[in-house]
């Protein structure tokens, strides 16, 4: 089974503007890591635009995109939040939030005009953004006795595993990150190198990565846990 471990998002806050019949729409798009990030961003935009008539928004989170919200903030139902969310989806993004502030120009735009304005301002913010494919990584912690340090460090180097942190007190503790789709095989190869056994022999000791992590302790003075 193929593991999908990338998603499209933006790297930093970007801005898009749209004007129609005197009304001005300013869209602010920002990357999100969790739902709790968005209220802070929304409050920041509100403080920057206290005289705006509306602060409409939408966000989507997660690999499956099942976590989302859209809000019209007083605009006619379905004319603001949904068009904003629609552009998030049209650009194929997730872990993204957008706030669009509207300054009323004195002329009503009607339902179709509002939908077009919120859609276009959001699209412009995304056109101004740097869109990237972000890789999802698994984080592991390796604990080991000092006599295993040469084997552990050699295995990490040979497999070019990314080291996040190192701590050497009573024992060695190293945190590493591995691309999610490659983590099971990489950990298997790491174990084989440290054990000085073949992949086949190592597989006989460890039926699967999940079994190994669930059981906790591992032989040969090395302990690996998934964080």
Report residues per predicted region:
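Short glycine-/aliphatic-rich beta-strand segments at the starts of folded cytosolic domains
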Residues: 131-146
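Short amphipathic alpha-helix segments
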Residues: 143-161
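Terminal, non-globular segments
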Residues: 176, 183-185
């Amino acid at each position: 089974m193929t593991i999908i471990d990338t998603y499209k998002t933006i790297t930093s806050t970007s801005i898009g503007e749209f004007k129609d019949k005197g009304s001005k729409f300013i869209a602010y798009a920002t990357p999100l890591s969790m739902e709790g990030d968005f209220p802070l961003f929304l409050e920041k935009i509100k403080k920057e635009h206290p005289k705006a008539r509306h602060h409409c928004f939408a966000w989507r989170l997660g690999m499956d995109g099942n976590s989302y919200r859209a809000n019209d903030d007083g605009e006619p139902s379905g004319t603001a939040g949904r068009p904003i969310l629609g552009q998030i989806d049209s650009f194929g993004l997730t872990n993204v939030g957008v706030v669009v502030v509207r300054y009323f120009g004195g002329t009503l735009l009607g339902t179709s005009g509002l939908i077009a304005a919120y859609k276009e301002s959001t699209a412009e913010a995304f056109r101004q953004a740097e869109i990237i494919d972000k890789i999802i990584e698994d984080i592991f912690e390796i604990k080991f006795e000092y006599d295993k340090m040469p084997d552990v460090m050699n295995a990490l180097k040979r497999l070019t595993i990314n080291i996040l942190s190192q701590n050497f007190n009573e024992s060695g503790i190293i945190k590493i990150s591995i691309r999610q789709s490659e983590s099971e095989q990489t950990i298997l190869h790491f174990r084989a190198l440290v054990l000085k056994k073949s992949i086949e022999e190592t597989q006989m000791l460890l039926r699967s990565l999940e079994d190994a992590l669930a059981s906790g302790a591992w032989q040969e003075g090395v302990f690996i846990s998934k964080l």
